[in-house]
């Protein structure tokens, strides 16, 4: 079992009515664990800053699955805001494993590709 201490989220939250412009929202996933390539659902604390005004809210990850491979890992993420029925689209995700190694997930359609670790083997 791999322990994930921090999961950095950055996604675009739709404006009022769902038709307005989107603005970035960041959050951190509480400590959880990865087992069999699936992460347990957890609450995240989100905070956003728009026009000098800051706000905070809570969102629940409806599904987060990470499948590892030799060089890259893919993940599919969907988050839903607790205060509305609209879904937030994640633009990228970064997480730190127990070895303090950071990996970022970049979107590719509905999938997220994990960037290969920089540097040689080790």
Curated annotation (Swiss-Prot):
It comes from the Viruses. This is Uncharacterized 12.4 kDa protein in 33 kDa protein region. It comes from Human adenovirus F serotype 41. The lineage of its organism: Viruses, Varidnaviria, Bamfordvirae, Preplasmiviricota, Tectiliviricetes.
């Amino acid at each position: 079992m791999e322990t994930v201490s921090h999961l950095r989220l950055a996604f675009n939250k739709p404006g009022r009515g769902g038709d307005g412009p989107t603005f970035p929202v960041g959050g951190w996933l509480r400590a959880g664990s990865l087992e069999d390539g699936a992460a347990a659902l957890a609450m995240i604390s989100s905070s956003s800053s728009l026009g000098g005004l800051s706000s905070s809210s809570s969102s629940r990850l409806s599904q987060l699955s990470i499948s590892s491979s030799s060089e890259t890992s893919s993940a599919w993420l969907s988050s839903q805001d607790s205060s509305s029925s609209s879904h937030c689209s994640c633009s990228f995700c970064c997480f730190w494993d127990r070895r303090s190694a950071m990996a970022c997930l970049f979107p590719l359609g509905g999938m997220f590709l994990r960037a290969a670790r920089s540097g040689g083997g080790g």
